[in-house]
Amino acid sequence: MGGQESISNNNSDSFIMSSPNLDSQESSISPIDEKKGTDMQTKSLSSYSKGTLLSKQVQNLLEEANKYDPIYGSSLPRGFLRDRNTKGKDNGLVPLVEKVIPPIHKKTNNRNTRKKSSTTTKKDVKKPKAAKVKGKNGRTNHKHTPISKQEIDTAREKKPLKKGRANKKNDRDSPSSTFVDWNGPCLRLQYPLFDIEYLRSHEIYSGTPIQSISLRTNSPQPTSLTSDNDTSSVTTAKLQSILFSNYMEEYKVDFKRSTAIYNPMSEIGKLIEYSCLVFLPSPYAEQLKETILPDLNASFDNSDTKGFVNAINLYNKMIREIPRQRIIDHLETIDKIPRSFIHDFLHIVYTRSIHPQANKLKHYKAFSNYVYGELLPNFLSDVYQQCQLKKGDTFMDLGSGVGNCVVQAALECGCALSFGCEIMDDASDLTILQYEELKKRCKLYGMRLNNVEFSLKKSFVDNNRVAELIPQCDVILVNNFLFDEDLNKKVEKILQTAKVGCKIISLKSLRSLTYQINFYNVENIFNRLKVQRYDLKEDSVSWTHSGGEYYISTVMEDVDESLFSPAARGRRNRGTPVKYTR
């Protein structure tokens, strides 16, 4: 009966006697056992001092246990886990209706994203020729809807049409029929992205970047066009460089093949549209937008190889007729570009250097410190902006993989130095390939690439160059999602010399929830970290589609006050207010 004993006598009278306690020796006894009870009380009083000592020991043990409560000690990244149903308690039973008639899952229409994704399949390319009508839910429906002349006139009065496009009724002009999101976020240039002096002094391009025609579209293995069995039926097209008249890149144009790995037609479309959005002065950009882009998009949507190649040839002819000096003068004046331009440019480099040998990145032990994973460009752009990474800053990536984060920080933010350290041999080899291709492509597009440095096939632990640069870093990236406790301790030791104001990006909190200031860690830099948790959006990392969480820790001059509040320490990652109870 939970610490109590039930005793029955011959008279069927029942008595309840409490088990001996450290703090209480109360009991209920019968008159018959009065003498026996008196002896028990005397014995209890004689051991009172011993019981008091035991009580203090137990209390100390409980305090120590609470100090290392698992709630405060460690926590899984909650964002990557499935949320519980908070509406009602799950009894584990499946409703009969749901058991007999399973729920219907709606099919998503990915047709409008076929161009913006470089890994689209052929079945997503074609679309009906019917006019598009925007539904209330924001999706595009292909159906014919009669519109009266009065409705057209009213619409014109409410919203003026774009100049030169007033009388066009073709669905080609809609934003959903473009390769690039024309309404996407823009990137304010913090430094001169284009190297004007280089462009003015070099009219001939002498680099040899990897050609698109050497890549497979449905296999990560490299090959040449002549190695395919059906090369005779493949149509090819050459795309004119917008800055160097002597350079043209050859592409395979084949809408019948799978483009699961690489889509050359989509890449052509993006490059032509970026010519309009970034490189060309206004008069030429409008001409390209009105004359060539509609036919280019329509031929892609209809899988019209002949029309697509014809649009490319018209583009090439137009580019050759534009004075090169006009383009250079325009590039000198621009102060913002589409953010996707940097992402797509880096993807072109990635497909040439990393894709053909991507299988090498799978050579690692599962769930170890050496697991390979990538942070995707959109997330990097967001977090660089949050950290206010800017021109002249020093950026470091501890565990840089193939160097994606390093080169994006260099191009997007204009860092004075972008540094990466990688220990794995295969990833280090691919880093060199990607960096060499990046340098060639930057020259081809007239882009400035600031100082980039790698420490390859070396650990960042006991690394002299890392130790030398840590005090200079403004932003440090540590993808510690699968770091074990031992490596996290070494990272803590490495970061001790970080300067005030340095921001550290991580996928798990650098400072354990059990961390406390004591006599032995008074000088630890973790005492001065202001740790902020953020929600990670979907499609931010390569190993999962789901969202999650990430942290930005800022090195402060003074001690973080939350370390002195147990309540604040407990809710540091929960974001809940303090609740006081009796």
Swiss-Prot record:
| Region annotation (Required for interaction with nucleosomes and DNA) ranges | 158-172
Q: What is this protein called?
A: Histone-lysine N-methyltransferase, H3 lysine-79 specific
Boundaries of every DOT1 domain copy: 254-568
Modified positions (Phosphothreonine) are T576
Q: Which residues carry this modification: Phosphoserine?
A: S565
Write the record's keywords in alphabetical order, separated by commas.
Chromatin regulator, DNA-binding, Methyltransferase, Nucleus, Phosphoprotein, Repeat, S-adenosyl-L-methionine, Transcription, Transcription regulation, Transferase
Kindly report the pH dependence of this protein's activity.
Answer: Optimum pH is 8 to 9.
Q: What is the lineage of its organism?
A: Eukaryota, Fungi, Dikarya, Ascomycota, Saccharomycotina
Q: How is its activity regulated?
A: Ubiquitination of histone H2B by the RAD6/UBC2-BRE1 complex to form H2BK123ub1 is required for efficient DOT1 methyltransferase activity on histone H3. Interaction with DNA is required for optimal histone methyltransferase activity.
Q: Which SUPFAM superfamilies match?
A: S-adenosyl-L-methionine-dependent methyltransferases
Could you tell me where the Polar residues compositional bias lies? 1-30, 39-50
Locate the region Disordered: 1-50, 99-177
> Gene3D superfamilies annotated for this entry?
1.10.260.170, Vaccinia Virus protein VP39
Q: Which cysteines are joined by disulfide bonds?
A: none
Further comment:
In contrast to other lysine histone methyltransferases, it does not contain a SET domain, suggesting the existence of another mechanism for methylation of lysine residues of histones. Present with 2160 molecules/cell in log phase SD medium.
Work out whether the entry's keyword set contains Phosphoprotein: yes
According to its UniProt entry, this protein's organism is Saccharomyces cerevisiae (strain ATCC 204508 / S288c)
Q: What happens when the gene is disrupted?
A: Leads to sensitivity to UV irradiation.
